[in-house]
Amino acid sequence: MMSKIVAIQGDHLSKLNPITDTSIFLANEIQNKNYKIFYYKPENLSVINSKIFAEGFFIKFNYNKKIFFKILKKQKLNLTKCKFILIRQDPPFNLEYISTTYILETIKDKVKIINDPTSIRNISEKLYSIKFLRYMPNTIFSQNIDEIKKFFRKNDRVVLKPIHTFGGNDIHLLDKFDLKFIKKFIKKHDHIICQKYLSKIYKGDKRVFLINGKIAGVISRVPKKGSFLSNMGKGAKAVNTKLTRIEKKISVLVAKNLKKENIFFAGIDFIDEKLNGDINVTSPTGLKTFYDLSKINLAKTFWEELKA
């Protein structure tokens, strides 16, 4: 029988920052509705006798304590006993990540899983943006040196990005074509993204939260002095902002596409009214930061849309 249990598949609790973490923010909201929170790491997911189990802990989150969680009970839980499962571990989107989507996929008709594991597997966070290239800065996806060299000739400054990392990791701004560096970068990452640098990033990007196919909110993230990276983990500062008419139009289009793909919760980013190509569906963040700025609780919206 299904119980009022929300399972969270996430990174080690020691990696979570209660001041900003979206997983904790979502868990705190739903535990106030008398749901139990079961937390486990991806490596503790197993298939035993055709049933899906996870070894983890029933926990209680508390924002007011120095230690922000209390372990109530360790347990091996049959995940079909849950009402919801949140896939919340950070990328890299590697074989272990993919394996968990195959395992959870087998029970998605019995338990509501956010985001849908099949959809997470099918939607590469950066490659999916190929559908929306007309709304992006000049961008190519390639590991062909000649094509990359041509791209540099047409664009003064170029941002190089890996396809399967996250959080602004290993992103570089090049003022000119550097064969040695680019060869090394390709050897490490295979296909890479080359994108025209948009100088207005110094004013900040915009992170748009999409919930159940609709625009739910937006914040701006301003890079720290001397940086072009707008990720909070790289020292950027969050501020209130609004979407322009163009950004709203593009956001609605992306949101509708993602809903068709069974993506319930996502984050997309704009720089100077252009999508930057990151369509975050694995573990979208920023809801707690948005609440701190606006006092609008999108965790409440999240669970209301799920009819929890």
What is the role of each PLM region?
Residues 145-146, 153-156, 164-258:
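Phosphate-binding site of ATP-dependent enzymes
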